[in-house]
Curated annotation (Swiss-Prot):
Transmembrane segments: none annotated. It catalyses: pseudouridine(1915) in 23S rRNA + S-adenosyl-L-methionine = N(3)-methylpseudouridine(1915) in 23S rRNA + S-adenosyl-L-homocysteine + H(+). Gene3D superfamilies: 3.40.1280.10. Signal peptide: none annotated. This is Ribosomal RNA large subunit methyltransferase H 1. The gene is rlmH1. Specifically methylates the pseudouridine at position 1915 (m3Psi1915) in 23S rRNA. The lineage of its organism: Bacteria, Bacillati, Bacillota, Clostridia, Thermoanaerobacterales.
Length: 133
């Protein structure tokens, strides 16, 4: 499975970047994953995104439990969807599904960190592995 995180922001704080990289490192044994930061939604590589299943992360999205998120990942894999793009930010009009991390407003770096953690947790759930060491 290939995942892309696109964050619509001028920048994210270095401590969020470090946390995201830590989860990406943990996820490498399960999937391929990358992060891109775009200053505005008009700079998204729309042509590249056409082939990908796009999940918009916004406070207006639907809530989903960790277990249901894991099942969603499994369901997409079963449907032979190999590319999933998570879009974090405003002004995004192309997506297949909308989720929320929280209905509270928070920084995009924090949202990406929490999403990376939940993706890692999803793989641990799907493999019946303990999450905490």
């Amino acid at each position: 499975m290939n995942y892309k995180f696109f964050i619509i922001a001028k920048k994210i704080e270095p401590f969020y970047q470090e946390a995201i990289e830590e989860y990406f490192k943990r996820l490498q044994r399960f999937c391929s994953i990358s992060l891109s930061i775009c200053k505005n939604s008009k700079k998204l590589p729309v042509k590249d995104l056409e082939k990908s299943y796009k999940i918009l992360i916004t406070p207006q999205g639907k809530t989903i439990s960790s277990e249901k998120f894991a099942l969603k990942i499994k369901d997409l894999e079963m449907k032979s969807i190999t590319d999933i793009t998570f879009l974090i930010g405003e002004g995004i009009e192309i997506f297949d599904e909308i989720f929320t991390i929280s209905q509270m407003k928070m920084s995009k770096g924090l949202i990406a960190t929490l999403l990376a953690e939940q993706l890692y947790r999803a793989y641990k759930i799907l493999r019946n592995e303990p999450y905490h060491k």
